[in-house]
Amino acid sequence: MKKLFTIDDLMIGFIMAIGYGLGFAVPKAMGWSDWESGLVCWVVGYVLQEAATRILFSKTVQSNTAYRYTVFGAFVLLFLAAEYAVMSWMGLSASDYLLEQYLYIIGLPVLMFAFQMAVRWYRIRKIREQYGDGSHGFVFDDALKKIDLDEVNRQNQPITGAYDTDLAVKTKTGIYVGVKEKNIIYYSGIPYAKPPVGERRWKAPEPLPESEAVFEAKYLGASAIQVEHEGSILKHHRQSEDCLTLNICTGAKKTDQKKPVLVLFHHGDFAYGGSADPLLDGVELIRSCPDIVGVSFNYRLGLFGFIDFSQVPGGDAYPDALNLGLLDQIAALKWIKENIAAFGGDPDRITVMGFASGAISICLLAACEQAKGLFRKAFVFQGNPQAAYETPDVSRNLAKKLLQETSATTMEELMQLSTDRLKEVSQKILHDLYPTGPTRDGRLIPPDAFEAYRNGSADHVEFLIGVARNERQVYKSVVGKQTYEDFITNELDIALQFLDTVNATDAQAVRDYIRELAETMPEIEAKAKVVEQCSALSGYLTARKLAESGKKVYLMYWNVKPLIENLGSGTVDVAAAFLGNREGAQMYGNVLNSDISEMLRKFLIKFLRGDAMRFYNNEIKGVGAIDWKRFPKALVISDNGLQCEPIEDKLTEETCLLRFMEAI
């Protein structure tokens, strides 16, 4: 954590105390009035503070201990010289004013810190009142009361009359007029492909024609048709098959220098979620660093985005339905690559950032020939390419189930079904744990992503991979207890059945480990703990294999305790911390740790810019030097701060689980 005071702060306080004390006493001794002396006092103190801060906290001084203490010595000598000069000239002693002013200067930060702690305590109390012990999962009722749903669900319209040209951006597909708020401009609901409706349902996204038409970009586009769980935040937001839109946020100040671009991939098990999730609001990140451009977007989900019709009569006309969600993502990245320069972004410095299913998507796109060159850096948290299905069996079963539920027999009949009917069926099928997601089909996605990495698919892509200690409770809080328990049991059973065919000894060792854990906790939680450890290990192995194939890889381990144990601490907390999203964290039952968030935002900005991943001492005031070394070291983030160290032994208590994940 940041220190309230460092030796540098105390030295600056020392200099300011002299400035304030003599700044008031000298004019007063010269016969000036109190207000004139007070004005001089403030000016002298402020100037000395700024000068001392710029000198002491400069990279040159803070990067070298000898320089720091040389500057300290110089400041002391300056004080002695000032003492001698003022004593000789006016008979005043700087020492007479030092203690009183020094206590005042040091006391102000203490009072501010106490105020911040009081505010934090108040927020924690409100969250605990709302969530209790967290056993009911995420609850958004209070947050939704503050939202004007009619306003949120409005749609952008064409503009035929006058518009604010300062807020207008011309792209290849149209002119979009955004909204300015303080030092930020938003462009929301911009289409990046033709609407996948009518005859384009279950077809690959088609590029938009070139246009000079003018459109509003004030309102978020519709979310994809999706499953609504107990802890879904987007129940209030309109949903539509016409969902292929993106949002752009950038600083309002014009500059000729092209900015790095951050593209956010939302989470949601490929079945729910979207860019309207307040958690993914990157405004605070852009506000704190306006020289980057933020982008978020929607893509098709569930049976609209990941379904195999190859065994349905007429299904051969829909060969891309298996991985439509990924094709949408590629289409979005292509639009961004072609148009982001108009918004001040650098098309050659695009970083993609994803959580959970968003992270899985990025790992798959890194292995995909169609996505090659569309991004240069990748931040993935709780995701790996092996999470995609090896065969289309699951997606074929989804199509079979769809036919059963709708009594349809052909693609022609499926195409005639209304959106509402398909949503109703989707809710039933997928809510009953009928899984959905991408498939390593050999067409779009290679069967072995790691082999593709070794063969150069992700050359020139730099990776930042994150894993969490307590992610399982986050998932439970979203989908509910029953779905969570069914998922844990099914995932583990399938994995163990596979391991039986590969290494029966390790499979039995895993079962023994579960029984051992079940002696001190419910069996389902023992299984969940194993699944959670396997998830973290899969991220670790992804980092290892990328590093072995010559990629630059940074690893991160989130080990922060949850505010409410039953809500966990993982994806939602990491997203809020890196984006500086205090309100998003509160909605999901936590209070943003501003110290951790400030440090992680700084690291993220360094990653986007291509700067060295290290802090020199006091680069962030109160934070010592941190050097985030590449894999196999990892940046461990805990309540006690950040440190870089190996983490393999932290991810599991049983080495058989590592072999288990290597086999899978």
Predicted regions and their residues:
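Juxtamembrane "helix-exit" motif on the non-cytosolic side of transmembrane helices
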Residues: 22-32, 55-58, 82-94
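Canonical alpha-helical transmembrane segments
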Residues: 44-62
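Non-catalytic accessory segments of hydrolases
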Residues: 113, 123-312, 316-323, 589-600, ...
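Substrate-access "cap/lid" subdomains that shape
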Residues: 231-234, 331, 338, 372, ...
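Alpha/beta-hydrolase active-site loop
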Residues: 318-341
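Alpha/beta-hydrolase fold nucleophile elbow
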Residues: 343-355
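Short glycine-enriched nucleophile-adjacent loop
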Residues: 359-371
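Mobile gating loops/cap/lid regions near enzyme active sites that modulate substrate access
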Residues: 534-664
